[in-house]
Amino acid sequence: MAKKITVVVDALTERHKKQIEQIAARYGYTVTFFQSNREAIPHLSDSEIVYGFGKKLAEAATGARWFCSSSAGVDSYRDTPVYQRKDILFSNSSGAYGVTIAEHIVMVTLDLLRRQMDYRQIVQEKRWVRNLPIRSIMGSRVTILGTGDLGRLAASRLRGFVPERITGINRSGVCDDPAFDFICPQTEVDRLLPETDILIMCLPGTSETDRFMDARRLSMLPTHAVLVNVGRGNAVDQRALAELLETDQLAGASLDVFEQEPIPQDDPIWTCKNLLITPHIAGNMTLDYTVDHGTDLFCEDLENYCTGRPLRRLVDCARGY
């Protein structure tokens, strides 16, 4: 097989491309850059390394020895060869999106607590109303589902707002990040939900997290609580969430990820009361830092691959992340 690398990341600048090319050349590889999967797919048959995103790209990379996804989430790859075959190394870009998603979490949390949706409506109606009751992150009980890169960075950013406590929940109940006051295993989530004012969801898309926040668990949250989901849409029962919002049994929610994307035009979720919708943009490659850091992460693992060292962001396909 030719020592060939195919890169399909349209956010890369010439500087990023040169950074990749310099490392590749050091080990005898040539690099071809494409702007779209459609353009790249006919040229993948002899590519040893593929860096990009998408199920169709992964399905076409049948000759690859290493497929690196430019995304952090890998649930869309489950039915592809890169996920199923043991002879293909499969890595992701976990760590590239933490900064931009953590800032998104802070933004929408403040938006919900400070009633910005209501005030936007008031201003559009040309009314001068200044006395809506608002709330603060200060003194709030924050629970974060998932203590990976996203959860840890969210905790560190929210820490500056002086919440009463920040509790992280993961499978093991172990995490040494000092941004958390407490770490609990998933088995304790039912105990913690009634004591949660702000619920941040950073869960990966796996069979284990499917409907993790179902109708039963959603109803355990206090009526004044707000929910933010930046992980995967399958982790929340959207219909149950909408019912709670519409009946004022939950104060507000912000969803960046959904059960079906794009959201169907006739889905009632579009007009749900007290719901802030963003179209899966919390972790896009629209922040320069994200593109820079994502490129650095790929180049780090490219060095590892070429020198026979283990990849740092190898996906555990059994776990789904």
Each predicted region: which residue ranges?
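Short loop/helix-cap segments at secondary-structure boundaries that form the rim of catalytic
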Residues: Q19-Q22, I41-L44, L57-T62, Y77-R85, ...
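Rossmann-like adenosine-cofactor binding region
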Residues: E164, G173-P268
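Glycine-rich NAD(P)-binding loop of Rossmann-like domains
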Residues: R120-L153
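Glycine-rich, N-terminal phosphate-binding loop of Rossmann-like dinucleotide-binding domains
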Residues: G54, S71, L203-P204, V230-G231, ...
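Phosphate/diphosphate ligand-binding glycine-rich loop within oxidoreductases
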Residues: D46-V123
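N-terminal glycine-/charge-rich "phosphate-binding" loop or analogous flexible N-terminal tail
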Residues: M1-S47
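Rossmann-like dinucleotide-binding domain for NAD(H)/NADP(H)
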Residues: H224, V230-Y321
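Oxidoreductase and adenylate-handling cofactor-binding alpha/beta cores
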Residues: A102-D118, F161, D296-R309
